[in-house]
Every structure is written in C-alpha cells, then in structure tokens.
C-alpha cells in the first residue's frame, strides 16, 4: 500500500464513529448490494433526509471500523471497507451497534482454498465460508460483544459447528477467542495463512480430483460414489 493510503487510513481510524439513529442496537447484516441500493435511492431523490443520512453515516461507519481493524492488526491492506464489500457478492458484513454507534464488525465470504489435509498431508481443494475480518472496538472489549457478534453470525449463516469455518490470518487474540468460546485449538499450519481447524475435515472424503467432499457420516455414500479409500476420511 502506498504511504499516502496508509496515512489516510490511519487518519480515518482516528475519526469518531457517527451516530446511526435509525439502526437499532444489536447486529445487522449488510452486503455490497444493500449499500448500493441505499446509495441509489439517495441519489434518485424521493427519499427522506433520514435515509440519505443513513447511507452516508453507515458507509462512514464501515470504513472507520475497517480502518481501525487494520490499524489494530498492524497490516498493510484494509480488509473491510465499503469498496471491498462490493468486490464480491459472497461478502457480507455483520455490524454490531450499541447506543446507535458501530462498535464491531465481522466480515464473511466464500473462498476457494487449497489446504493441507491433516491425515493425508496432501493438498485438497475446499470452498468454505471464511472469517475475513473480525474487530470489536477497544473501548468495548471484554464485555461479551465479540461473542454476541460471532454467535449471531453463526445463526444467520446456519453454521451448525464453528469448526466448519476457515479464518484468514487470525491473530493470537482471535485464536484465544476460538479456544475460550468454542474449544477449538487443533489445526495444521497452512501456506496461505488460513486456519482450518481439524474438525473441519470431519465426515469428509477426498475425490480423485483432490476436492474435499462432505458426507453424512465417515462411511457415507459420497465415499462410495467417488471410490475414495476410507483412509482418506476424517471421523466427526
């Protein structure tokens, strides 16, 4: 990232988060398409000043919290912004608000990954739902907001087991969060820096083309259909 962009994001991170008067406290979900609809409605006119105000302040909130996340993690590239949300229709952002101000973000999206299988030690292709960015404002940490945000996401995404998610470059703090709240610790280090817990591979088999297939049981019909050997399977 160019130095000018880094300075811009640092300045943005220091801005005060605007009040979102029309957004109820709790967790809301936003996609690039949602934000585009808000922007289009505001530009067309015919909407009240309140809606125009929401579009501007919501987008600013997302950009500020994304910049704060980048600053906290000490990384060069911003992971969450309105522009980044528009890059893929699989991206969705969970925004946590308290007292009508954004205090946390959780960005999710589907990615195609090649990861090392913990049993065969070979590369397999997976396309999991991924945690791409997770941030709670420093002033609101250790108050249960992170767990509230994560639990809401799991429910909204219909994820029955947290280990079915992949996490992009998690910090030690996030790994500690996963251990504390979900008992997840075992994973094989990956070249791409994603963390995929060993439980992700439960009830799976590997096709002849190297794609991980999920079965209903360790000896499910998918294994028979692909002709994959049972030794490539992981128990649940």
UniProtKB/Swiss-Prot annotation:
SUPFAM superfamilies per UniProt: Acyl-CoA N-acyltransferases (Nat)
InterPro entries xrefs: Acyl_CoA_acyltransferase (IPR016181), Atat (IPR038746), GNAT_ATAT (IPR007965)
Bias (Low complexity) ranges: 219-229
Catalytic activity: L-lysyl-[alpha-tubulin] + acetyl-CoA = N(6)-acetyl-L-lysyl-[alpha-tubulin] + CoA + H(+)
EC number of this enzyme: 2.3.1.108
Domain N-acetyltransferase, residue spans: 21-201
Enzyme class label: transferase
Protein name (Swiss-Prot/TrEMBL): Alpha-tubulin N-acetyltransferase
Organism of derivation: Leishmania braziliensis
């Amino acid at each position: 990232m160019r130095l000018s962009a880094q300075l811009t994001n640092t300045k943005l991170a220091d801005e005060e988060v605007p009040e979102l008067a029309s957004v109820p406290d709790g967790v809301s979900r936003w996609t690039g398409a949602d934000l585009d609809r808000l922007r289009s409605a505001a530009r067309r006119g015919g909407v009240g000043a309140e809606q125009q105000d929401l579009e501007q302040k919501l987008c600013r909130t997302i950009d500020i919290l994304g910049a704060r996340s980048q600053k906290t993690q000490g990384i060069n590239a911003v992971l969450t912004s309105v522009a980044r949300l528009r890059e893929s229709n699989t991206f969705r952002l969970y925004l946590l608000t308290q007292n009508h101000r954004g205090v946390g973000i959780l960005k999710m999206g589907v990615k195609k990954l090649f990861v090392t299988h913990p049993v065969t030690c070979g590369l397999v292709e997976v396309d999991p739902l991924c945690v791409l960015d997770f941030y709670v404002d420093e002033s609101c940490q250790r108050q249960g907001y992170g767990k509230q945000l994560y639990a809401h996401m799991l429910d909204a995404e219909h994820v029955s087991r947290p280990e079915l998610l992949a996490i992009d470059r998690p910090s030690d703090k996030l790994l500690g969060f996963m251990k504390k709240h979900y008992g997840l610790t075992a994973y094989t280090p990956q070249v791409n820096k994603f963390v995929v817990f060993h439980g992700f591979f439960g009830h799976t088999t590997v096709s002849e083309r190297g794609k991980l297939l999920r079965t209903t049981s360790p000896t499910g019909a998918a294994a028979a259909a692909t002709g994959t050997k049972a030794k490539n399977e992981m128990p649940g």
